[in-house]
Amino acid sequence: MGIIKPFRIKSFKHKNPSIEFKDVSIAFGNRPVLDKVNFKINQKTIHGLLGPNGAGKSTMYHLITGLLEPKHGKILIDNEDVTKLPVYLRTRKYGISFVPQYGGTFSDLTLIDNLKAISEIVVKNKDLRLERINYLISKLELENIKNIKAKNLSGGERKKLTIALS
């Protein structure tokens, strides 16, 4: 497998968005996970998020991608409050997505149907959609398994699919 050249959907206006949390809090039941968290990740920088199990790392990723909403505070991307912005709009506008550790696929759909389903949300132009799908299938070496249901893929094949879906 070779290196995959990154590409951006042409509609992305923000190629390197900044991400900021302002007084973000979230709890699961009575258990606070994040309490008035403040930070900013500037454009064109790389950061790692480290901490023990249960520290809130995955929760922060879910908040950034829109899979969770904070109980309090704001999440800004390029100084725009995206706290209430749906997941698909964050992906379409900013190119922000999340590759889950487990799951992340439609288990009863084939690999190619998984890619088609997600690309219809993100890429409006049908020709561009098919071009991107074919590119990903080729680069991730998925050609021989594109018609197999996700639930029947190996763990590594499923991980490749979740990377393609992100």
Language model features: what each stretch is:
Residues 149-153:
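Conserved ABC ATPase signature
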Residues 73-81, 92-94, 137:
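Conserved ABC transporter NBD signature motif
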Residues 127-145:
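Conserved ABC ATPase "signature" region
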Residues 50-52:
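The feature captures the beta-strand-to-loop junction immediately N-terminal to the Walker
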Residues 19-21, 34:
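Conserved structural motif at the start of ABC-family nucleotide-binding domains
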Residues 81-97, 102, 126-130, 147:
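ABC ATPase NBD coupling module
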Residues 29, 47, 85, 113-128, ...:
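ABC-type ATPase nucleotide-binding domains, specifically the catalytic core motifs of the NBD
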